């Protein structure tokens, strides 16, 4: 364990998910002193959910945007055992700042302080769930697909896929793309516009009459987990009727999970992700601060991409540190 009051590391990494953990491992292998902070909790609140059976490995790797079990806990434990250069802390970092000497300081929720030459943000993102009663329960029970291919292979070929055209998916272009994609996977599609009559009319004029795509305009009163299958959802409508759906698709918007971009006054993209440089890989708008994983890619969140970004982060940070150690220092900025 590093002495938080005296020892200055090469890199502080906030976030122990795929991007942060992979970056920590790669940097440790390159003999850079790394402190990895992870404060994730078990993201599935329902203890009865059998995550091993409900989330296939390929689903987690290729499509998952939802909060998932902490599958990287064993990896972080192994990093701490196998790499003498990496220390893993489960403290929750609450404050970061750049010091006058150009180093970075992080403080946890009990007042411990760490410093390093470089700061890496890989603290992830969180979903903004729509304000529909019961949605959060169905989401946590993983009954809402975030990609049509998430479910068992070929399970939608003879089924109806319900699409919730709410939130970001209530925008016409996004709604159309989503509905057409859903129809590619399912025998039929039912679109819930949640009372948005204008969206319903716009969709009707752009969807083929024989496409087997129905539009339901009645506002949704609540969602309820069904009892016949792990994916079933009962949609209760404001007119008192209910529709049992075997599969429901929706992709909620995402936002940054931590306060660090705001504390460091980092530039953000239009989607709200941390903007990273096109010239200096993974560098943010503040020299010495790098970002990767979901916090730098809100729109495309998969484990494969996060792992790749973690490796890229490590390469970029290592190059900076090694140039500082053995070459002429050149400030990296756009």
Swiss-Prot record:
Entry's Gene Ontology molecular function annotations: oxidoreductase activity
Pfam families assigned to the protein according to its UniProt record, in alphabetical order: Pyr_redox_2
Example GO biological process: cellular response to toxic substance
Group of enzyme by EC: oxidoreductase
Gene3D superfamilies assigned: FAD/NAD(P)-binding domain (3.50.50.60)
Pathway given in the UniProt record: Mycotoxin biosynthesis
Keyword terms, alphabetized: FAD, Flavoprotein, Oxidoreductase
Residues noted as binding FAD in the record, renumbered to the chain: 16-19, 38-43, 93, 122, 294, 302-303
Cofactor note: Binds 1 FAD per subunit.
Entry EC number(s): 1.8.1.-
Cofactor: FAD
InterPro entries from the UniProt entry: FAD/NAD-bd_sf (IPR036188), FAD/NAD-binding_dom (IPR023753), Ferredoxin-NADP_redctase_2 (IPR050097)
Keyword Flavoprotein: yes
Membrane-crossing segments per the record: none
Protein family membership: Belongs to the class-II pyridine nucleotide-disulfide oxidoreductase family.
Function summary: Thioredoxin reductase; part of the gene cluster that mediates the biosynthesis of aspirochlorine (or antibiotic A30641), an unusual halogenated spiro compound with distinctive antifungal properties due to selective inhibition of protein biosynthesis, and which is also active against bacteria, viruses, and murine tumor cells. The non-ribosomal peptide synthetase (NRPS) aclP is responsible the formation of the diketopiperazine (DKP) core from the condensation of 2 phenylalanine residues.
Subunit structure: Homodimer.
PANTHER family linked: THIOREDOXIN REDUCTASE 1-RELATED-RELATED (PTHR48105)
Protein name as annotated: Thioredoxin reductase aclT
Lineage: Eukaryota, Fungi, Dikarya, Ascomycota, Pezizomycotina
């Amino acid at each position: 364990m590093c002495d938080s009051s005296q020892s200055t590391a090469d890199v502080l990494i906030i976030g122990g998910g795929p991007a942060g953990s992979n970056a920590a491992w790669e940097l440790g292998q390159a003999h850079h002193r790394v402190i990895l902070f992870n404060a994730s909790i078990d993201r599935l609140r329902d203890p009865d959910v059998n995550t091993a059976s409900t989330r296939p490995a390929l689903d987690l790797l290729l499509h998952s945007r939802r909060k998932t079990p902490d599958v990287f806990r064993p990896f972080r434990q192994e990093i701490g055992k196998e790499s003498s250069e990496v220390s893993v802390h489960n403290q929750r970092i609450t404050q970061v700042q750049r010091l006058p000497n150009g180093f970075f300081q992080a403080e946890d929720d009990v007042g411990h302080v760490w410093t390093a030459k470089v700061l890496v943000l890989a603290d992830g993102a969180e979903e903004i769930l729509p304000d529909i009663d019961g949605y959060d329960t169905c989401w946590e029970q993983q009954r809402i697909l975030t990609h049509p291919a998430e479910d068992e292979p070929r399970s939608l070929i003879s089924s109806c896929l319900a699409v919730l055209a709410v939130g970001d998916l209530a925008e016409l272009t996004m709604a159309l793309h989503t509905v057409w994609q859903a129809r590619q996977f399912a025998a039929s599609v039912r679109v819930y516009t949640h009372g948005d009559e204008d969206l319903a009319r716009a969709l009707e004029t752009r969807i083929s009459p024989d496409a087997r795509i129905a539009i339901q305009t009645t506002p949704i009163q609540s969602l309820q987990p069904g009892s016949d299958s792990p994916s079933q959802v009962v949609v209760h409508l404001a007119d008192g009727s209910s529709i049992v759906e075997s599969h429901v698709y929706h992709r909620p918007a995402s936002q940054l999970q931590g306060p660090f971009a705001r504390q460091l006054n980092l530039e953000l993209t239009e989607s709200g992700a941390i903007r990273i440089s096109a010239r200096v890989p993974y560098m943010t708008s503040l020299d010495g601060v790098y970002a990767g994983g979901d916090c730098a890619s809100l729109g495309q969140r998969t484990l494969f991409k996060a792992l790749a970004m973690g490796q890229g982060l490590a390469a970029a940070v290592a190059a900076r540190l090694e140039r500082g150690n053995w070459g002429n220092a050149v400030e990296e900025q756009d």
